[in-house]
C-alpha cells in the first residue's frame, strides 16, 4: 500500500521484518474445537517467540489474537517483541466488530494494529478481502485453522503462495463443513500440521518446551 497507518507499539514496527511471524486465519463461525485450536496454537507459537498476524475478525482471528497475548505472558516478552499484529479493514478509529473493542485495546497496548485505510473509513465489505494480502505479506507462512468452501481464508492462502510464503493447514473431521477448506488446501500441497511443534519444524525454528 502507499500508506500504512499504525497504532500501538509503533516503536517495534521497524523490527517486524526481522521477526518470525505467522498469519493465522480461518472461519468467522468456527467449531468449538476450531476455536480451541486457534487459541492453543497461537499461545504456544507466541510463547516460542513468533508474532501472530491476523485480522481481528470474529471466530478464528479473535481466538488467535487472544492466544498470542497469553503466549506473550508465558514467555515474558520484551517490550520490543510483538505478540500479535491485527491488520484491519477499517480506519484505526473504528473497531470492527464491536465485540472486539476490548481485544483491540489489549492488542494496541501490547502489539500493533495496522490499516491501509485512513481514519474514518467504515467497515466496507470490499476492504476485508483486500487487507488479506497484507496479513499474508507480513508473515513467513499462513496457517489456516478452519475454513469452509468457499472461504476468505483461502484467498489469504492463495495470496501467501503468490508472495512465496508457505501455507499450512490443520485437518479436521471429514464430515465437518468448516474443515473442507483445510482439506482442499492439503490436497493442493499445503503442509498438514497437528501441533504448534509441527509449525515450528516446518519453519525450521527451535521447538519450545
Task: Give residue spans per PLM region.
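Glycine-biased, small-residue-rich flexible motifs in mid-sequence functional cores and linkers
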Residues: 1-209
Amino acid at each position: 500500500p502507499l500508506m500504512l497507518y499504525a497504532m500501538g507499539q509503533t516503536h517495534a514496527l521497524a523490527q517486524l521484518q526481522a521477526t518470525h511471524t505467522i498469519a493465522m486465519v480461518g472461519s468467522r463461525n468456527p467449531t468449538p474445537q476450531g476455536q480451541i485450536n486457534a487459541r492453543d496454537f497461537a499461545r504456544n507459537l507466541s510463547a516460542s517467540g513468533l508474532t501472530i498476524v491476523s485480522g481481528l475478525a470474529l471466530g478464528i482471528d479473535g481466538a488467535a489474537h487472544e492466544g498470542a497475548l497469553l503466549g506473550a505472558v508465558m514467555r515474558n516478552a520484551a517490550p520490543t517483541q510483538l505478540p500479535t499484529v491485527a491488520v484491519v479493514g477499517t480506519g484505526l478509529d473504528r473497531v470492527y466488530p464491536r465485540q472486539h473493542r476490548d481485544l483491540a485495546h489489549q492488542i494496541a497496548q501490547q502489539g500493533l494494529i495496522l490499516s491501509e485505510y485512513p481514519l474514518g473509513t467504515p467497515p466496507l465489505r470490499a476492504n476485508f478481502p483486500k487487507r488479506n494480502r497484507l496479513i499474508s505479506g507480513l508473515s513467513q507462512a499462513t496457517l489456516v485453522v478452519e475454513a469452509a468452501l468457499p472461504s476468505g481464508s483461502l484467498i489469504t492462502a492463495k495470496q501467501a503462495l503468490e508472495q512465496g510464503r508457505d501455507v499450512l493447514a490443520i485437518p479436521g473431521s471429514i464430515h465437518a463443513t468448516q474443515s473442507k477448506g483445510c482439506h482442499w488446501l492439503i490436497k493442493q500441497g499445503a503442509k498438514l500440521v497437528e501441533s504448534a511443534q509441527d509449525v515450528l519444524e516446518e519453519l525450521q525454528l527451535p521447538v519450545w518446551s
